[in-house]
A protein has these predicted regions:
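C-terminal motif of bacterial Sec signal peptides marking the signal peptidase cleavage site
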Residues: 16-18
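Cystatin/cathelin-like cysteine-protease inhibitor module
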Residues: 20-210
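Bacterial N-terminal signal peptides
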Residues: 8-14
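Bacterial N-terminal signal peptides that target proteins for export
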Residues: 1-7
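Short amphipathic alpha-helical "recognition" segments used for binding
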Residues: 7-8, 210
Length: 210
């Protein structure tokens, strides 16, 4: 009787020990194609919203929103070194986001910036927006770090607003690219080059806040 009872107790202990062991969690798939596609969609949607909002509110009508939207399709967006890491005991994905603006697009934005940002150079505007953030702009490229967790469909759930703030800064950078070739100054059509010269020599109308 004792041996039988002891055997039952031993078996129960083994079963309980087996049940109490936690099954190892599956590794996060941080490099799913859906992640990069989601990022690109977020950027393109933000560009579209910001460009249309500015064009709608600017009574000077200097900007063609469609030009900015088209420029967004030419951006080179990369997600580098995606890997699983841990944040406060939670398994998450970490990756480096890089968004490169083509040379011709950035040059046009810089040239047109006086019609949008007045006497503030595009580089100074960017410096103000980057201050205090983990976003870097160098060699035509925005760089930052994203933290996210893939959902059951592989789409990323981001841990903070880094992506949205990056997209907004990118939108502000590309906004001057959308300046029309011919704009209206004092009711007269002039080339954007002439408009820049005119506006640099006088106080410009305050543009909508970007």
């Amino acid at each position: 009787m004792y041996k039988k009872t002891a055997s039952v107790l031993i078996l129960s202990t083994i079963l309980l020990a087996a049940c109490s062991k936690e099954e190892p969690k599956a590794a996060l798939d941080c490099a799913q194609p859906a992640t990069l596609q989601n990022i690109r969609t977020t950027i393109e949607d933000t560009l579209k919203q910001q460009a249309r909002s500015f064009a709608r509110n600017d009574n000077r009508q200097f900007v063609d929103a469609d030009k900015i939207i088209a420029a967004g399709l030419e951006l080179e967006t990369l997600l580098e070194d995606p890997k699983e890491t841990e944040d406060n005991g939670k398994a998450i994905c970490r990756a480096n986001l890089k968004i490169r603006i083509p040379d011709t697009i950035l040059k046009t934005a810089i040239d047109n910036s006086p019609l949008i940002y007045g006497n503030t150079p595009l580089s100074d505007m960017l410096e103000q927006k980057l201050m205090g953030s983990n976003l870097i702009f160098e060699n035509n490229t925005f760089s930052t770090t994203l933290l996210y967790t893939p959902d059951k469909d592989g789409k990323p759930v981001f841990e903070d607003n880094t992506l949205s703030s990056t997209a907004q800064t990118l939108s502000a950078t590309l906004l001057p690219y959308g300046v029309k070739s011919i704009v209206m100054i004092d009711g007269k059509p002039v080339s954007k080059e002439q408009a820049i010269k005119l506006l640099q020599n006088q106080n410009t109308e305050e543009p909508p806040t970007v």
